[in-house]
């Protein structure tokens, strides 16, 4: 099975299945000498962890990370960094009655069509539990980026038709929706609980930003920065849309309103007076804040009766019980941050190979 490794210089490989013994990752290409805080990696995993609130899955997993290689005396050695998280609360028995049925909205049918065989225990490799490796690897990327003054942040900006109206970043980790608008966050929690009671689920939007990114990152033509970021985001389970800057709003704009005038800043650097472009022009970073939004579909595992077929094509009814997220948004926030950090770390190191004075 190819496609388990992401990046060219700073590379992440993830492994493991939802109900297997463990999941994990290997980070290769991390320069030696980077301070690696296991506590920071654990905090990032805790933000992604199931069972953290009433708007997430009830599965109880400590997600305790173990660093197996590549770190000595708190610093990266330059060798591959391998990290492991054991699955301690897997309950494959929840899937016994539906293992021969194709769950609507899931990858069951497509994996069968591709491989002719699949791990039916919670989706196996296609489960979002695979993203543990992404968040752990993304934490390493964040530690590398921090040395260059680059930071990444994300938040829940929309749930259904509820949209954040105020952006107060200090509120993001103060509420279980990770929404920067405290008033709207409370409404979102109520909406999620309504959906859960109705045996349904909800989708929404997460906004992701990167700050301190220097101009010049990105590789034309096919490895444009937004192309690699787009691939990274679309590789996350449940993501159905990605937009940068004004996104699809550009369809309603003119060139004169969308163009961002270039200016000379007080410190002598060149920037733009506005940021409709979202920090990337021609596939290369401009030095402005990188701004993107990702749309997540409602989780497919719902307890409502649904129509489907079994592997033989026979009609069947299915109800998916067990422990599932009514919305992916709060746990998507750290995953999206991780993927953006991985792309930026990779392109930062690639840029250092592109010119001798980089």
Curated annotation (Swiss-Prot):
It catalyses: 5-O-(1-carboxyvinyl)-3-phosphoshikimate = chorismate + phosphate. Keywords: Amino-acid biosynthesis, Aromatic amino acid biosynthesis, FAD, Flavoprotein, FMN, Lyase, NADP. PROSITE patterns: CHORISMATE_SYNTHASE_1, CHORISMATE_SYNTHASE_2. GO terms for molecular function: chorismate synthase activity; FMN binding. FMN binds at residues 125-127, 282, 297-301, 323. Its cofactor is FMNH2. Pathway: Metabolic intermediate biosynthesis; chorismate biosynthesis; chorismate from D-erythrose 4-phosphate and phosphoenolpyruvate: step 7/7. NADP(+) binds at residues 48, 54. Its EC number is 4.2.3.5. It comes from the Bacteria. It holds the Pfam family Chorismate_synt. One of its GO terms (cellular component) is cytosol. SUPFAM superfamilies: Chorismate synthase, AroC (SSF103263). This reaction introduces a second double bond into the aromatic ring system. HAMAP family: Chorismate_synth (MF_00300). Belongs to the chorismate synthase family. Homotetramer. NCBIfam families: aroC (TIGR00033), PRK05382.1 (NF003793). This is Chorismate synthase. The gene is aroC.
């Amino acid at each position: 099975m190819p496609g388990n490794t992401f990046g060219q210089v700073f590379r992440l490989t993830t492994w493991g299945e939802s109900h297997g013994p463990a999941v994990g990752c290997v980070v290769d290409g991390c320069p030696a000498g980077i301070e690696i805080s296991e506590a920071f990696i654990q905090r990032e995993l805790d933000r992604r962890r199931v069972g953290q609130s009433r708007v997430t899955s009830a599965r109880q997993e400590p997600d305790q990370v173990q660093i197996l290689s590549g770190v000595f005396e708190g610093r990266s050695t330059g060798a591959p960094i391998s990290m492991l998280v054991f699955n301690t609360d897997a309950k494959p028995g929840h899937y016994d009655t539906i293992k021969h049925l194709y769950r609507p909205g899931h990858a069951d049918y497509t994996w069968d069509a591709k491989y002719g065989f699949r791990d039916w225990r919670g989706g196996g490799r296609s489960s979002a539990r695979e993203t543990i490796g992404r968040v752990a690897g993304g934490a390493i990327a964040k530690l590398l980026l921090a040395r260059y003054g680059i930071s990444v942040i994300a938040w829940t900006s929309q749930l259904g038709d509820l949209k954040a109206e105020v952006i107060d970043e200090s509120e993001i980790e103060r509420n279980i929706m990770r929404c920067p608008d405290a008033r709207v966050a409370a409404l979102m929690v109520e909406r999620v609980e309504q959906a859960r009671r109705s045996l349904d689920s909800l989708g929404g939007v997460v906004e992701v930003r990167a700050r301190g990114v220097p101009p010049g990152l990105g590789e034309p033509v096919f490895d444009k920065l937004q192309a690699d970021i787009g691939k990274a985001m679309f590789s996350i389970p449940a993501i159905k849309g990605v937009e940068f800057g004004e996104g699809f709003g550009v369809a309603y704009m003119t060139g004169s309103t969308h163009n961002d005038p270039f200016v000379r800043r007080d410190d002598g650097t060149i920037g733009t007076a506005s940021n409709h472009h979202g920090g990337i022009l021609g596939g290369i970073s401009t030095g402005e804040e990188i701004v993107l939004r990702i749309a997540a579909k409602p989780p497919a595992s719902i307890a409502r009766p649904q129509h489907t077929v079994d592997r033989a094509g026979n009609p069947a009814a299915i109800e998916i019980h067990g422990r599932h997220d009514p919305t992916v948004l709060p746990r998507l926030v750290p995953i999206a941050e991780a993927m953006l950090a991985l792309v930026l770390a990779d392109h930062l190191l690639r840029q250092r190979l592109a010119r001798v004075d980089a």
